[in-house]
Regions:
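A short, surface-exposed interaction/processing loop segment used at functional sites
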Residues: 79-98
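A surface-exposed partner-binding patch
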Residues: 1-69, 74
């Protein structure tokens, strides 16, 4: 993965990132879920080799071994999958968009 996001982010997710700011993380209260800032997205996806195992998705956060994704050049749906099962089992839908996800 190069040093920048080279596809169009979903509208609501892009808005969420803008509201969060360039740095930092969003921690979902009492859940263990962390959503990454725009500055961390490329590094996290490179570290976990997401491009190799799930090339159509971008990891946007995680809760331990459970990761959360958006589909590249797609709608605002948030998906989830176990990091140890990437590429071998289908993504599950977690929410219709990031704002529903953080409720």
């Amino acid at each position: 993965m190069n040093n920048q996001i080279d596809f169009v982010l979903p509208v609501l997710y892009d808005k969420f990132l803008s509201e969060m700011g360039e740095d930092g993380e969003f921690n979902l209260e009492d859940s263990g879920i962390t959503l990454y800032s725009k500055a961390d997205l490329v590094e996290r996806n490179t570290t976990y080799q997401i491009e190799e195992w799930e090339p159509d998705y971008l990891m946007i956060g995680q809760d331990g071994d459970l990761a959360f994704f958006i589909k590249k050049d797609s709608d605002d749906t948030i998906y989830m999958n176990d990091l140890g099962a990437l590429g071998s089992i289908q993504m599950e839908i977690a929410a219709s968009d990031v704002y529903e996800f953080i409720k």
